[in-house]
Each structure stands twice: as structure tokens, then as C-alpha cells.
Amino acid sequence: MHQMQAGPGMFLYAHDVPQAVAIRGKERLLTACGKNVTDSKHYCCKECQIADWKPHKGVCKSKYLKESYAPGWVVENRIPAFMAGPPLAMFGSLQYFWGNIPALDLLKVKDNEGEEAIMQRDVALLFAASGDLRNVIKTIIGLPESYAGNCTVVVNDLNTAIVARNAMLLLTALHFEPEVAAPIMLHLWYSAMLPQAILQALQDGILPYIHDVCNKIKDKPTDSMQAKTFEIGGSSVRLMLKKREWVGLATMFKVPEGLRAPEAQSIRRSVTMTRVDHIDRHIYKMSPGRRAGAIDFRQHGVLLPFGASRKDFAMPNP
């Protein structure tokens, strides 16, 4: 068997099959379960097909992939929980790691100043109570590629955990080459589990910056504000935190002692897989494929193409 990279016109399906491959075209492909349909999962050979049958069987026969899918309260002929409870009920932790609306481009250069007019102008942006970085990133990449001005962005938030993750993401973008930084940022941002290689890259590449600051401010008052500017390749990130927040940031590069993958997933699923009536209401109008993908992400919390191997994602995201 030969390994190939998936691309346009290719099919890839591999849970934990180490050598599962994708082949262009359909004439040599084997379907997973004899279903001769366009969106069926395909394999390069019988060996891969057999090796992947056990995980595929559960997916293929999933109720979420059926056009006839109905919410649990319909199947069981009962009143859904959200109809019987209070109009507003708090649930889960009070952490808001992701925003609940799509990213916004605050500048929309083409619709306002215009690309030519802004090309040499300096831009200063404030994202107060920013939450995650989606609006920051959407706005920055909206600038023309040949933009030659200085762009200064100030980002703050009251939530220390959000600020810490934003700092890790920005330092990752600053330190690593784009093709290395992109997958690290993606999974640090959205995946509940990480490969050891990503954790190691963060610990080797970014954590020394934080340790250096912590060593220099060790004698400062706990609640004193301390700032450090990191400069690489003409870009810079200035991070201003309280001393205790710098110390806390350093701990976020390592998995908490004693927390293993099964326990981390159990804690996560106690939130993501409960309140089934609310979940059913959310996914009911989705297409079968999107519905199955949404449930898969709720169960495993790894942002990968549906069916891609999660084998290397064995470390809890700190």
C-alpha cells in the first residue's frame, strides 16, 4: 500500500488504520459496506477496508445519518425537556472559549476607505472584551496583501483563561513559520485533545519566552502589572499581565498532573453529551452528514475531517 495526500477529487477515510490511503478516481475504490452511493466511504484495498470495518460500522449505521432521523422526544412520544423547564437555565461552566456569532471584519476596507486609499495609512484597532481572536484575525487578513502601513491592534478581556489562550495563539503565529503555526493554532483553539508533537512544540518554542519573563519578575508584587514585548521578523506582540497571570500562563503549556485522556474526555462529555433534547433540537434540521459530524465533535472534541484518524490526539488540551 502507498500513502498519498488527499486533495480535490480524492477520497479519504481512516479512523485508526495507519496506512489507509486515498486514490484519485472511483474505478479501483472499494466501498466500506457495499453501498454504491456517491458519498460512500472508499478504500484503496480490501486490507484497509477490513481493518476499518469496526469503527465504520458504528458510523455507517448511525441514526444521525438517516434521512428519517427524528428527535428522541418524537420517537418516545413525550414532551421535550426544554418545553417543561424554565425559560432560561444556566448550564455548564461560565467559560466562553468560542464566540457564538461568525467572525466580523471591522474594517471592510473594500466597502469603506478602499484598498488603494488605505495602502499607506497606519491603522489602530481596539478589541475591548474581545473574547477569542476570530474578529481580530478576520479583520487583519482583510487588509490588502501589499499593505505597507503599520497596524497596531490592542486586545483585552476580563477572562484570564481567554487572555492566556489568545497570548499562546499570537506567540505561536509570531514564532513559527505559517505552515507549522496554522495546525498548532487550529487545534489549540478548537480541539479538546492534542498530539504530543503539538504540546512539545509549544513547550519547546513558546514556553521559554514565558519562563524568561517569570524569572525576571519573580520579586515583583503578585498583582503588579508586568509587560513584555516579543519581536520576531518585523512583527511584535506586547503582552501585559499581572505577575500571577504570567505564572498562571506558564502552567497552561502542560497537562495538569494526574489528568489523563479518559478522564479529560469524561469531564468534557458530561457537558457536551447531556441535555439530549437540546442537542436533538439543535441538529434536527441539519443535513445527515453535518448532523453526524456535529455529534462526532461533541463526542471526541477533535477538529478533523470526519473519519480522519484521531490516533495521535492523545493528550488533553491544557
Question: Model regions: which residues?
Answer:
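Class I S-adenosyl-L-methionine-dependent methyltransferase module
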Residues: 122, 144-318
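N-terminal charged/capping segments associated with class I S-adenosyl-L-methionine
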Residues: 1-37, 42-144, 158-165, 173, ...
